[in-house]
């Protein structure tokens, strides 16, 4: 089985999550009798309500063609400059990017921010002009705008020689000419496999993985997601965490190893270089830490987590209306909720004042 790791970049409401839904359906990720919500990758309530991507997330599809199965890990990136640290960490896991633009609106300012990060990392883009069936579509002008965008971001010659697809995510088809109005997403699968390079990593070396996402499970505790840069990881294997300076954070065992299958994390017995996996078993390790075999002493290069840009103080409500509305009115409840959120959200830091 071959492997591809790719990220999708798009502005708000340009159809990224709808297109990924169709990739799921046409690759057989969803069973015929499985009830699936629209915009399945929008996982929290605010994302579903606003149609935006706040938290990066991983998923995968398997595409079979000519007797060969290709496992494609897809990373859905935040589309906002506010989440810059997360954007850069996520892009370090992939080997190519899909730039999805609206056929009428073209590339937007927030698209420029994330695309610039991808090009600076040397990733090769695929341009998808989505919503090609819009009556006000202007695909030729939008393609020119994408080329001008890449030029302004100092793309190299190889990055400027990008493939172009025209698609309708809602109707589930893509083609290589702007007059396409039917079909399926086979051209997109073919382009991903042919244009995005397979991970060129070291399967024989010692196990190393850079933690890029942090989550928390009520039963398993802290879960760290990243791409294995070298070696092999087995369940119950001894591991340790190193900070960005190489200082030890903790030692432990990989009590659970998960791969991504569709929208779900699926337990696996082992994984190897190039795989994007989630690991349980560590209690202190966090994003930007290197998770590695016990004999490893040098951490992987990592960008430190950006500090929060907004500070808030929560104090006891001493107004005349205190306690009249709501059922969770104690400051202790707010404290517990913030601390619980900080366990799985590296953008939040909670500091208690003297006296609680």
What positions do the PLM features span?
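Structural and coupling elements of P-loop NTPases
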Residues: 1-356
């Amino acid at each position: 089985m071959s492997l591809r790791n790719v990220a999708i970049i798009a502005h708000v409401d340009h159809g990224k999550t709808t297109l990924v839904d169709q990739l799921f359906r046409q690759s057989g990720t969803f069973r015929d009798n499985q009830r699936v919500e629209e915009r399945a990758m929008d996982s929290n309530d605010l994302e579903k309500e606003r149609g935006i991507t706040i938290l990066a997330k991983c998923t995968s599809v398997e595409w079979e063609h000519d007797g060969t199965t290709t496992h494609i890990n897809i990373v859905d990136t935040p589309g906002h400059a506010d989440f810059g640290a997360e954007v850069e960490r996520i892009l370090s896991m992939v080997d190519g990017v899909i730039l999805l633009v609206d056929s009428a609106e073209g590339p937007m300012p927030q698209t420029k921010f994330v695309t610039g990060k991808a090009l600076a990392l040397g990733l090769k883009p695929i341009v998808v002009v989505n919503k090609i069936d819009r009556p006000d579509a202007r695909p030729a002008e939008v393609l020119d705008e994408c080329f001008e965008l890449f030029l302004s971001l100092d793309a190299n010659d190889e990055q400027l020689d990008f493939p172009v697809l025209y698609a309708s995510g809602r109707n589930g088809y893509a083609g290589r000419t702007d007059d396409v109005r039917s079909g399926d997403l086979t051209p997109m699968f073919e382009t991903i496999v042919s244009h995005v390079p397979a991970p060129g990593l070291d399967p024989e070396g010692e196990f190393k993985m850079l933690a890029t996402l942090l989550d928390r499970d009520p039963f398993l505790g802290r879960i760290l997601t990243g791409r294995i840069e070298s070696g092999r990881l087995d369940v119950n294997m001894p591991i340790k965490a190193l900070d960005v300076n190489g200082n030890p954070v903790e030692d432990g065992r990989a009590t659970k190893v998960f791969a991504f299958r569709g929208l779900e994390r699926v337990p696996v017995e082992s994984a190897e270089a190039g795989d994007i996996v989630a690991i349980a078993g560590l209690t202190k390790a966090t994003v930007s830490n290197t998770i590695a075999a016990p004999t490893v002493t040098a951490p992987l290069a990592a960008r430190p987590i950006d500090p929060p840009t907004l500070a808030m103080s929560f104090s006891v409500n001493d107004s005349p209306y205190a306690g009249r509305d709501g059922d969770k009115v104690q400051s202790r409840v707010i404290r517990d909720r913030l601390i619980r959120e900080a366990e799985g959200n590296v953008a939040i830091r909670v500091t208690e004042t003297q006296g609680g």
